[in-house]
């Protein structure tokens, strides 16, 4: 019996089972399931290379984070815009190439309706200028454009804070500002202070109406406007350290062709030596009195480029000095802090007149 049972069990291994339709074959007892797939585990925070989840470096991650915050400068809430400016102030990058993106986003906020946003923006401009010297000069065209727009803005609060931004340029980029935007800045100042360049009845009546509508906040803001005007005139009408350093070079030593050759050379500080000849100007005189008088007139302001010191002085004396002195004298009579600042501006103009007299005597 035992032998028959053993033979029957051995025979089962060689018997092919009959499968029913629709059913799979039975799996053997020693079957191993291999249908699973392995999953990788990623730990980017513990990576030696210190890369983010997207595989970018820390510098690229900072740029991406900065781009996100710069997009919030156009947020509808003024509190959010202020917080973004504070964040940018605290996380200014050391890479100068990122500042182009920063200035492109924050410069339009000069015209922001919120006073807190504009105040924070002034601090941010100063921080950028201190961290990256010369960075404001690279973006001075767009900055000056928005500053002049703020100085002539319809909103009085925006006009009141406009000279705070102008003061930043006077402190950190005085030469670039005076060379490229002296005439435009002076004309914007006349609009800001409700002054007139001409004595015609229409302009005078408009100035009287505008000054009568000035509120208390605007009158208080005139103190800051006059203080910045004083600094602007000092930087534009008097030689700075860079100009004096250039003037120390004696052309007679450099050019040794003839002992008096320097008398016939064009000064290096003069950008438009032949501008009075108007060789490239296609314009007709509006008044016969303006012909060959050797002075600049209001009609010439749109075509003047006052890049050198002599041209700026001549433009100021011929066009701006008389109305500026007239309006400053009226402010001096008011007294108080406004009169004190106006008197300091008059001191700058008096110093200019004395220096011009010395130059005329030396010639």
UniProtKB/Swiss-Prot annotation:
Signal peptide: none annotated. Gene3D superfamilies: Leucine-rich Repeat Variant. It is found in: Nucleus. The keyword Nucleus applies. One of its GO terms (cellular component) is rixosome complex. GO terms for molecular function: chromatin binding. The keyword Calcium does not apply. Keywords: Nucleus, Ribosome biogenesis, rRNA processing. Its main location: nucleus. Disulfide bonds: none annotated. Transmembrane segments: none annotated. Residues 1-38 are annotated as: Disordered. GO terms for biological process: maturation of LSU-rRNA from tricistronic rRNA transcript (SSU-rRNA, 5.8S rRNA, LSU-rRNA); pre-replicative complex assembly involved in nuclear cell cycle DNA replication; regulation of DNA-templated DNA replication initiation; ribosomal large subunit assembly. Component of the RIX1 complex required for processing of ITS2 sequences from 35S pre-rRNA. Belongs to the IPI1/TEX10 family. Component of the RIX1 complex, composed of IPI1, RIX1/IPI2 and IPI3 in a 1:2:2 stoichiometry. The complex interacts (via RIX1) with MDN1 (via its hexameric AAA ATPase ring) and the pre-60S ribosome particles. PANTHER family: REGULATOR OF MICROTUBULE DYNAMICS PROTEIN, TESTIS-EXPRESSED PROTEIN 10. This is Pre-rRNA-processing protein IPI1. It comes from Scheffersomyces stipitis (strain ATCC 58785 / CBS 6054 / NBRC 10063 / NRRL Y-11545) (Yeast). The gene is IPI1.
């Amino acid at each position: 019996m035992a032998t028959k049972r053993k033979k029957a069990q051995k025979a089962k291994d060689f018997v092919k089972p009959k499968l029913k339709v629709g059913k799979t074959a039975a799996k053997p007892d020693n079957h191993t399931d291999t249908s699973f797939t392995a999953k990788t585990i990623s730990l980017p925070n513990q990576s030696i290379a210190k890369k983010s989840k997207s595989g970018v470096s820390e510098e690229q991650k900072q740029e991406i984070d900065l781009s996100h915050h710069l997009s919030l400068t156009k947020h509808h809430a003024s509190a959010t815009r202020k917080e973004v400016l504070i964040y940018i102030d605290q996380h200014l990058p050391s890479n100068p190439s990122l500042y182009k993106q920063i200035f492109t986003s924050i410069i339009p906020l000069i015209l922001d309706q919120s006073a807190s946003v504009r105040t924070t923006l002034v601090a941010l401009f100063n921080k950028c200028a201190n961290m990256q010297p010369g960075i404001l000069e690279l973006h001075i065209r767009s900055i000056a454009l928005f500053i002049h727009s703020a100085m002539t803005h319809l909103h009085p609060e925006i006009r009141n804070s406009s000279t705070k931004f102008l003061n930043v340029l006077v402190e950190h980029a005085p030469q670039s500002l005076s060379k490229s935007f002296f005439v435009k800045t002076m004309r914007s100042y006349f609009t800001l202070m409700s002054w007139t360049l001409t004595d015609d009845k229409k302009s005078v009546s408009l100035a009287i109406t505008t000054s009568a509508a000035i509120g208390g906040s605007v009158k208080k803001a005139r103190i800051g406007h006059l203080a910045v005007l004083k600094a602007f005139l000092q930087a534009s009408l008097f030689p700075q350290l860079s100009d004096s350093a250039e003037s120390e070079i004696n052309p007679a030593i450099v050019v040794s062709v003839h002992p008096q050759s320097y008398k016939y050379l064009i000064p290096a500080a003069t950008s438009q030596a032949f501008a009075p000849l108007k060789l490239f100007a296609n314009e007709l005189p509006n008044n016969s009195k303006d012909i060959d008088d050797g002075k600049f007139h209001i009609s010439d302001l749109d075509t003047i480029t006052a890049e050198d010191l002599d041209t700026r002085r001549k433009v100021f004396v011929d066009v701006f000095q008389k109305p500026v002195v007239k309006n400053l004298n009226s402010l001096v009579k008011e007294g108080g802090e406004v009169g004190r600042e106006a008197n300091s501006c008059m001191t700058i103009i008096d110093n200019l007149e004395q220096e011009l007299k010395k130059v005329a005597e030396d010639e």
